[in-house]
């Protein structure tokens, strides 16, 4: 049994814990503690009731020291609650923690990971892109087989790299990609304003519900980290839109082989059934963003929107639940790190 602690119980931290109980991994992973500066009452309430993903299937109660999760067999799981801002003071050694899932979105350097290690944890997995000095960055389904036992401090990438990189790999393996551009159409996030207010990024001073808002992205750097051969071959832009969840990614690539739409779509179908099973899905149904809410895949390719120009320029629409899909990949990578 892998003993895990979650550092940061926000959108991703809560989704990871919920996903554990909605998956087949609960008999392999035990969450022994959650470190969060908020009060236990708020932690339990937001875990039980979620505006995006609905009510949690199990009853959740709490006291000042534990979250309690009732199970169908009448037993109860308990998760220790911690409120420690200093990573070096966390009691990972006494709790015998094997792996930290750091879901704060704040920490991501090797030095941050070492603080968890020095506090007694064996390994650390960050929920967002980390520094180049980390032991590895994993996009599960693409390069998780590069994990080594000595890799102690690892990044799980981002929701967008987890979405687009498996699709890029499938197309590149089949046809060879020369270059590409990506537009991320991302739901609003909690670093935006409810109404106009001050922010260091002037575009983010504007109300999230009122505008489509361009934001900076380093997605192309994330692609280069996994595929060095694509250095300076991809560029990306990102906009935030007034929806609560689910992201669409507009991928355009120039490829070395003359193809038709069906060639591209069939490649994704084949990958979804084989090498990228449970990672990438495929649909041609007339769906909209909300239909992909709570979808555990990293990416869902909408084949009805695939276009090919002049045999070599390919455009694809790829969906993902930027919270739920990523949370499920955190669990997959956690198990891969335990081997």
From Swiss-Prot:
Q: Which reaction does it catalyse?
A: D-erythrose 4-phosphate + NAD(+) + H2O = 4-phospho-D-erythronate + NADH + 2 H(+)
Domain of life of the source: Bacteria
Q: Which GO terms describe its biological process?
A: pyridoxal phosphate biosynthetic process; pyridoxine biosynthetic process
The first-level EC class reads oxidoreductase
Residues annotated as binding NAD(+) are: 11-12, 322
Show the InterPro entries listed in the entry: E4P_DH_bac, GlycerAld/Erythrose_P_DH, GlycerAld_3-P_DH_cat, GlycerAld_3-P_DH_NAD(P)-bd, NAD(P)-bd_dom_sf
Q: Which UniProt keywords apply?
A: Cytoplasm, NAD, Oxidoreductase, Pyridoxine biosynthesis
Where is this gene product found?
Cytoplasm
Q: Where in the chain is the site Activates thiol group during catalysis?
A: 186
MF terms in GO: erythrose-4-phosphate dehydrogenase activity; NAD binding
According to the UniProt record, one GO cellular component term is: cytoplasm
CDD domains on file: GAPDH_C_E4PDH (cd23937), GAPDH_N_E4PDH (cd17892)
Which residues of this UniProt protein bind substrate? 158-160, 204, 217-218, 240
Q: Which family does it belong to?
A: Belongs to the glyceraldehyde-3-phosphate dehydrogenase family. Epd subfamily.
Subunit and partners: Homotetramer.
Protein name, as recorded: D-erythrose-4-phosphate dehydrogenase
Gene symbol? epd
């Amino acid at each position: 049994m892998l003993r895990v602690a979650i550092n940061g119980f926000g959108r991703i931290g809560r989704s990871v814990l919920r996903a554990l109980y909605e998956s087949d991994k609960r008999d392999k992973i035990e969450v022994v503690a959650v470190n969060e500066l908020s009060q236990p009452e708020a932690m339990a309430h937001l875990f039980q009731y979620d505006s995006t993903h609905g009510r949690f299937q199990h009853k959740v109660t709490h006291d000042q020291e534990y979250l309690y999760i009732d199970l169908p067999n009448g037993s109860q799981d308990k998760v220790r609650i911690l409120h420690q801002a200093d990573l070096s003071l966390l009691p990972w050694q006494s709790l015998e923690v094997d792996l930290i899932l750091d879901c704060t979105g704040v920490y991501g350097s090797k030095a941050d990971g070492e603080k968890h290690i020095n506090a007694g944890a064996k390994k650390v997995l960050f929920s967002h892109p980390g520094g180049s000095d980390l032991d590895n960055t994993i996009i599960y389904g693409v390069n998780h087989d590069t994990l080594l036992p000595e890799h102690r401090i690892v990044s799980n990438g981002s929701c967008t790299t987890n979405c687009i990189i498996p699709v890029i790999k499938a197309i590149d393996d089949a046809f060879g990609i020369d270059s590409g551009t990506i537009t991320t159409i991302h739901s609003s996030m909690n670093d935006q304003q409810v109404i106009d207010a001050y922010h260091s990024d002037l575009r983010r001073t504007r109300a999230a519900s009122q505008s489509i808002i361009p934001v900076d992205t380093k997605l192309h750097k994330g692609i280069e980290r996994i595929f060095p051969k694509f250095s300076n071959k991809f560029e990306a832009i990102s906009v935030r839109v007034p929806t609560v969840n689910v992201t669409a990614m507009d991928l355009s690539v120039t490829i070395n082989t003359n193809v038709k739409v069906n060639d591209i779509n069939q490649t994704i179908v084949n990958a979804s059934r084989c090498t990228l099973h449970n990672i990438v899905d495929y649909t041609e149904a007339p769906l909209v963003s909300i239909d992909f809410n709570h979808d555990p895949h990293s990416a869902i390719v909408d084949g009805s929107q695939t276009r090919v120009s002049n045999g070599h320029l390919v455009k694809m629409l790829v969906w993902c639940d930027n919270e739920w899909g990523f949370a499920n990949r955190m669990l997959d990578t956690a198990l891969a790190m335990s081997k």
